[in-house]
């Protein structure tokens, strides 16, 4: 068991007195009474200068809180962004993003992106959804929404959503009418004896399946040959 370090001669007298009182010592040491009667008044042990250490610690703390300058030169603003084109934002893009996020399968439908003269929009009347010279798609919803907004403020989100919902429901009606018309036409043609050839997808699946069957036969033959050897 570790003992407390004696820092002064008076500690020896106190410790010895306690041991005598507790019975640890059966008799007083020879020097006990002389030491108790003439206690030392001067401590010759070197003590650390706590005030000096406190000042050093305070000075180190002040250094940590000082402002440290890491650059010898001022920071220069990079000018490369000044020559980049300005980001253009249109309300039509916002409507397209909403529509195709809600109707991802519309992106799978074939689209005509080439115009005959480049001014087909001149002959389009967006007071109604159906256009004789344009196929029904997501762009129809966008243009119809813009037409319904009219002169209203573009930042009016409530008016924008109302116009979009109206154009969207008109789109649904025309899309369902197209589907019914296509199904009816196919049934009528089948009833009158029309023969429909296989589509490109069906032909590709047929050739793919044939390749798989050929590979399966060759794999079985190779397996049997290796087993016989």
Swiss-Prot record:
GO cellular component term, pick one: mitochondrial small ribosomal subunit
Species in which this protein is naturally found: Yarrowia lipolytica (strain CLIB 122 / E 150)
GO MF annotation list: structural constituent of ribosome
Assembly behavior: Component of the mitochondrial small ribosomal subunit.
Keywords recorded for this protein, A-Z: Mitochondrion, Ribonucleoprotein, Ribosomal protein
Family (UniProt): Belongs to the mitochondrion-specific ribosomal protein mS23 family.
Subcellular location as annotated: Mitochondrion
Protein name stated in the entry: Small ribosomal subunit protein mS23
